[in-house]
Amino acid sequence: MCLAIPVRIEELLDEQSAVACIGGLRKTINVALLDDLKVGDYVILHVGFALQKLDEAEAQRTLALLAELGRLAEAEQAAQGEAP
């Protein structure tokens, strides 16, 4: 299963690439599909490509939901006696 996730643009390298913060890690991503990006913008990232701009509030809501999903999965594994 593949997910598209919100990431924050930390640095613009050129017209086709940028550095984004993904779960605390910095990674170079392809931004060729989008125009007028600025440092601090949030984008939806899928398999290394920025697909769409996203406002910060929606990005934060989505990231919070993904974090909650991770916590629920860990709790379910613990309840079943599995290691996370």
Swiss-Prot record:
Q: Which PROSITE patterns match?
A: HUPF_HYPC
Gene Ontology molecular functions: carbon dioxide binding; iron ion binding
State the coiled-coil residue ranges.
Answer: none
What InterPro entries does the record point to?
Answer: Hydgase_assmbl_chp_CS, Hydrogenase_HupF/HypC
Q: Which SUPFAM superfamilies match?
A: HupF/HypC-like
Q: Which GO terms describe its biological process?
A: protein maturation
The pathway noted for it is: Protein modification; [NiFe] hydrogenase maturation
Gene3D superfamilies, per the entry: 2.30.30.140
Protein family according to the UniProt entry: Belongs to the HupF/HypC family.
Q: Write out the function statement from the record.
A: Involved in the maturation of [NiFe] hydrogenases. Involved in the biosynthesis of the Fe(CN)(2)CO cofactor.
Q: State the PANTHER family in the record.
A: HYDROGENASE MATURATION FACTOR HYBG (PTHR35177:SF2)
Q: What is this protein called?
A: Hydrogenase maturation factor HypC
Q: Which organism is it from?
A: Azotobacter vinelandii
Gene name, per UniProt, is hypC
